[in-house]
A protein has these predicted regions:
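Conserved core segment of the aminotransferase class I/II
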Residues: 142-198
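Conserved core of the PLP fold type I
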Residues: 1-114, 126-140, 144
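Residue-level marker for buried hydrophobic side chains located in beta-strands
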Residues: 119-120
Length: 198
């Protein structure tokens, strides 16, 4: 359990890089609006990711902002050079969840075009949306989920969050498929934590 959602983000970025799943300069997608650390962290010198933003620009005919994404903008996720997508769902600060149509489109793209896409979903505002459904429920093998207790319990001072990952996931598989030299480095790194670090 990390020290709140912000710390969880730092651990996730570091872990993905330290385990050779994201490399400096890799393409990632940020769904905006987004909690600001997701904007700031990728620009730090140790990451310098190539960030592509998908903005929630959809509006109704009478000019009401729906805080949803245009389906055509999701096509950027088809590109296998896009390694990860960071989604704050429900959005922060507007607190709008992804529509079922958008969720279905993301699922379709991952299954048909980019099966190794790592999805990091920040579900901290989930309790504010009736009948909320996380990306983790739709794409459990691809999704890392961040959840913080501060919003639900109104206790921001607690600084307590969780990072959830399905037991059967692409992250472990991609680590197993790394070149032998990188696997050896990881085996050495984790040997103090596990009798079987492989």
């Amino acid at each position: 359990a990390p020290d709140g959602g912000s710390a969880a983000m730092c651990y996730i970025f570091d872990s993905l890089q330290q385990n050779f799943l994201l490399n400096k300069g890799d393409k990632i997608v940020l769904f905006a609006p987004v909690f600001t650390p997701y904007i700031e962290i990728p620009e730090q010198a140790r990451y310098l990711f190539n960030v592509i933003e998908i903005k929630a620009l959809k509006m109704t005919k009478d000019g009401y902002h729906t805080w949803q994404y245009q389906e055509k903008d999701l096509d950027v996720l088809k590109d296998p050079s896009v390694k990860a997508a960071f989604i704050t769902n429900p959005s922060n600060p507007p607190s709008y969840g992804l529509t079922k149509a958008l969720m279905n489109r993301i699922v379709e793209i991952v299954r048909n075009d980019n099966p190794n896409l790592m999805i990091i979903t920040d579900d901290v505002y989930a309790t504010f949306i009736p009948h909320f459904r996380s990306m983790m429920a739709e794409l459990p093998k691809n999704t890392l989920c961040v959840y913080s207790f501060s919003k639900y319990f109104g206790a921001t001072g607690w600084r307590l969050a969780i990072i959830a990952l399905h037991q059967d996931n692409i992250y472990d598989r991609m680590i197993r498929e790394l070149p032998r030299d990188k696997q050896e480095l990881l085996k050495k790194r984790y040997s103090s934590l596990s009798l079987h670090p492989e």
